[in-house]
């Protein structure tokens, strides 16, 4: 029996049907991409708030911030614990730093959301008690904005998802149409918290479909072939097979930065996820060609994003 307040067990056992899935191709990417006005300024292209980093995991914040800036977003502010200030300032000079007021090592303080056009939370965040409280407070603030008709797109990844699994009732605070981006391990933790079957990949896909439809959330299940579950039964699937060049620590942080930056530019969360997946996979191919699959690291993916855009977008 699922946890109290969650859908009954017989509502999520169903046959996964991918025959009507949309395929994320180069053509799909080009069709979704919006031309950038030549007279635009940084305000035209959005402002991402990235909440990331913990003592010992500041590199995740660096990777996510660098990739977000490569996505085309006008401005990125990184909320970081004090221990990461100097690292971020040097590694990502283009980012604006918002240093946590209360903690040396983790996210613990409240954040003013004024001026941001999207929020991404999770890379290298840690799961401290102070961070769990800060996440709850943020979700409540975003849910209030949703109710008031001034929603902010939200992307939850990595330790933000692990915190949801630790306290499954936080799921009820996640605003509709937000995007969750679990890899298979994170998805299993969420499933176990909700008493959902999770042993096989098919179990995880069924659970993703159930969560997407019942909570009106977008859910990107990250595997060698990513599946994007969208409410009302929609499904997007990445074209082609896997690429082991992407199977490296930090790869998911790069994807989160890309998706967050795209959402901040005004793309719907599901559009940002599809575009981000396509860019990420293309960057993986480019990095593999440059470095080989074994030698590719997450920073190589960030460095390949510009070339990925050139491959994916038709010449002017």
Regions from the language model: what does each represent?
Residues 3, 11-154, 162-179, 184-316:
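Small-residue (G/A/S/T)-rich helix-start motifs and N-terminal tracts that mark the onset
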């Amino acid at each position: 029996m699922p946890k109290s307040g969650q859908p009954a067990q017989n509502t999520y056992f169903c046959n996964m049907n991918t025959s009507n899935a949309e395929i994320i191709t180069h053509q799909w990417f080009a069709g979704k991409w919006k031309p950038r006005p030549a007279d635009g300024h940084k305000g035209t292209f959005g402002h991402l708030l990235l909440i990331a980093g913990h003592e010992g995991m500041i590199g995740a914040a660096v990777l996510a911030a660098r990739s977000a800036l490569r996505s085309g977003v006008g401005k990125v502010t990184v909320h970081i614990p004090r221990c990461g200030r100097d690292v971020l300032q040097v590694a990502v000079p283009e980012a604006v730093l918002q240093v946590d007021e209360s903690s040396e090592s983790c996210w613990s303080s409240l954040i003013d959301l004024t001026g941001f056009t999207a929020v991404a939370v999770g890379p290298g965040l840690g799961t401290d008690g102070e961070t769990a409280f800060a996440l709850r407070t943020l979700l409540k603030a975003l849910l209030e904005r949703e109710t008031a008709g001034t929603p902010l797109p939200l992307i939850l990844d990595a330790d933000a998802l692990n915190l949801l699994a630790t306290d499954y009732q936080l799921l009820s605070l996640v605003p509709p149409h937000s995007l969750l981006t679990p890899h298979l391990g994170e998805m299993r933790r969420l499933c176990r918290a909700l008493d959902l079957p999770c042993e096989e990949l098919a179990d995880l896909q069924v659970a993703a479909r159930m969560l997407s439809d019942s909570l009106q959330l977008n859910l990107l299940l990250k595997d060698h072939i990513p599946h994007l579950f969208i409410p009302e039964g929609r499904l997007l699937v990445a074209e082609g097979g896997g690429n082991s060049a992407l199977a490296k620590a930090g790869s998911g942080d790069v994807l989160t930065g890309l998706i967050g930056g795209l959402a901040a530019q005004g793309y719907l969360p599901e559009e940002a996820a599809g575009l981000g997946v396509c860019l990420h996979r293309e960057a993986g191919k480019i990095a593999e060609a440059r470095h080989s699959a074994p030698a590719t690291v997450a920073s190589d993916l960030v460095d390949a994003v510009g070339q990925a855009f050139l491959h994916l977008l038709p010449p002017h």
